[in-house]
Amino acid sequence: MDIVSLAWAALMIVFTFSLSLVVWGRSGL
């Protein structure tokens, strides 16, 4: 795995985590 695909994977993980955190926060749990 090269550095570009590794950076894309990390970016997708952070984006998915932040998005789910916003949805989870808005649901009031």
From Swiss-Prot:
Keyword Cell cycle annotated: no
Transmembrane segments: 3-23
Signal peptide: none
Main location: plastid
Keyword Transmembrane (UniProt): yes
An example Gene Ontology molecular-function term: electron transporter, transferring electrons within cytochrome b6/f complex of photosystem II activity
Membrane topology designation: Single-pass membrane protein
GO CC aspect terms: cytochrome b6f complex; plastid membrane; thylakoid membrane
Keywords: Electron transport, Membrane, Photosynthesis, Plastid, Transmembrane, Transmembrane helix, Transport
InterPro entries for the chain: Cytochr_b6-f_cplx_su8_sf (IPR036143), Cytochrome_b6-f_cplx_su8 (IPR005497)
Gene Ontology annotations of biological process type: cytochrome complex assembly; photosynthesis
SS bonds (residue pairs): none
Subcellular location: Plastid membrane
HAMAP family referenced in this protein's UniProt entry, alphabetically: Cytb6_f_PetN (MF_00395)
Family label: Belongs to the PetN family.
Summary of subunit composition and partner proteins: The 4 large subunits of the cytochrome b6-f complex are cytochrome b6, subunit IV (17 kDa polypeptide, PetD), cytochrome f and the Rieske protein, while the 4 small subunits are PetG, PetL, PetM and PetN. The complex functions as a dimer.
Summary of the function given for this chain in its UniProt record: Component of the cytochrome b6-f complex, which mediates electron transfer between photosystem II (PSII) and photosystem I (PSI), cyclic electron flow around PSI, and state transitions.
Protein name: Cytochrome b6-f complex subunit 8
Gene: petN
